[in-house]
Amino acid sequence: MKESFNFILNDRPEILKGSLIISAFNLVLSACVMIGLPIIITQKMGFQLETANRLYGYIEGAMGAGSLTGGIIGGIFAKKIKIKNCSLLLIICSLSILPIALVLSFNLPVITSYVIIMISSFIMMMLATLFSIQLMSCLQMLTPNKLLGKVISCVMCISMCATPVGQAFYGMIFQKFSNIPQTVFFGALSIGVIIGICTIKLFRNLEETMHTNYSEI
């Protein structure tokens, strides 16, 4: 484990930066959706508790289908999606929760709002999975085979540590802004877009590094 962390810190700081990007994504967007959607569906849309729980189950199903779709797209179009475009994926993924914030801001029919939330959740998870696949593939290509398992374990450890922190944070935030939950979603997507913009140069450099490694091979 020490060898893998030394490799990440000293030899390939790009891998550390990639890990921190995934962490930031989990902290800002994933945690917001994981905490916010159950609150919205079960408490803010006026459904009976049993109905609300069932409808949230459908939302989780849509998110799972989105993840599966993102995985399939990532497998089919892996060579066509460039790592330099990952910043764009991040930005679009962040914007995919904009409809959720909007339906909470306007007095739309409940079923219409629910369908929009479901579609947005599907798209967000599809793009998030696609982003994760592309970034993890890139990080694997930058890692020697002898360290691959250890380095990927470190990356997953770093990236997953942010999720419980984000959940605790959003638990408090949604409680404080319980009457205006759309504010939380607007804030999360804004930060997500900023993160995406700030990573444009990083992903371009990663693309160049990958080409350099491939040429050397």
Where are these regions (language model features)?
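A single, central transmembrane helix in multi-pass transporters
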Residues: 6-69
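Hydrophobic residues in alpha-helical segments
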Residues: 1, 8-10, 130, 142
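C-terminal transmembrane bundle of multi-pass solute transporters/carriers
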Residues: 42-217
